[in-house]
């Protein structure tokens, strides 16, 4: 039985049926007294966190639930730097103050290390708030993959202007 078969009354589940097609339901926990459901899905391709949130919100509303949590569990080989926008969504929702430091950042994944290059400074703040560790935990839980996270500060306006001064001195 597929995810879309169980929650067939949800318009969002039908809208995003392709995202969940051929995936498996690993686990369903029902807490009747709290009207809460927890589902662990194993999709065959990564699914945007915004899709998961929209589907969960609709299921909660349509089925009159108090809460629903949808967890995703992917094959390790599906992880790449292309998943970074989903990591950003998770981190900025969990740590509201991190959004300004992560805005414009980019990621590369190679040899077991996810390297995040910030557009500005902010590495120290992100590290002191445990962002790197949270990313490791998220990837471990979703992909069964252990990785290292490296955060690199980007240029600031001061760096830019000092480079112009160096250029103008020639």
Language model: regions and residue ranges:
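Intrinsically disordered, low-complexity basic tails and flexible linkers associated
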Residues: 1-170
